[in-house]
């Protein structure tokens, strides 16, 4: 079976510890008006949750939702407290190449050399400013 993947489409999710950073990243990526194009020419952007930082959730549940979306979407972003849990869970899926990144340099290397399609971040270690730079690198760095 051949699956058709939508170019520059993204599914984003987090556990309860990553909600604030996920919301920041999501809000950064969507256009301010209907006429404004999305940043990085995103054709589809799906927020799979969670939406409440006070309600604990098992991160594998969110990873499963992003993994399902990546059957037809090109990119995924996963956020938890450290980034390690979502990375390990994501890499269990055969169509996912995930890396836990903490710097823009990490993202660029992972895209260039490993062709990651899922960026994982730890909300306890990545600032909003660094996350913004990492997202930009994720969508603008090509595999060599």
Residue ranges, per PLM feature:
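C-terminal binding/interaction regions
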Residues: 4-5, 11-20, 24, 104-144
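Short, conserved beta-strand edge motifs with alternating hydrophobic and charged residues
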Residues: 13, 45-49, 76-80
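Short, solvent-exposed amphipathic alpha-helices that sit
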Residues: 20-32, 36
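A general structural signal for well-ordered alpha-helical segments in protein cores
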Residues: 22, 63, 86-87, 131
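Generic secondary-structure signature for well-ordered alpha-helical cores
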Residues: 30-35, 43, 68-72, 112, ...
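A short beta-strand-loop structural module common to alpha/beta enzyme folds
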Residues: 38-59
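Short, structured active-site "lid" loops
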Residues: 60-82
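Mid-chain, well-packed structural core segment of small domains
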Residues: 76-124
């Amino acid at each position: 079976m051949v699956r058709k993947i939508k170019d520059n489409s993204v599914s984003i999710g987090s556990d309860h510890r990553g909600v604030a950073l996920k919301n920041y990243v999501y809000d950064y990526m969507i256009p301010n008006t209907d006429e404004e194009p999305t940043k990085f020419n995103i054709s589809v952007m799906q927020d799979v949750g969670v939406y409440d930082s006070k309600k604990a959730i098992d991160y594998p549940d969110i990873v499963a939702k992003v993994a399902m979306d990546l059957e037809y979407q090109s990119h995924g972003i996963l956020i938890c407290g450290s980034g390690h849990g979502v990375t390990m869970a994501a890499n269990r899926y055969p169509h996912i190449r995930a890396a836990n990144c903490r710097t823009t340099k990490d993202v660029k290397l992972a895209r260039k050399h490993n062709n990651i399609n899922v960026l994982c971040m730890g909300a306890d270690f990545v600032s909003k400013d660094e996350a913004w730079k990492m997202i930009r690198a994720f969508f603008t760095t090509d595999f060599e």
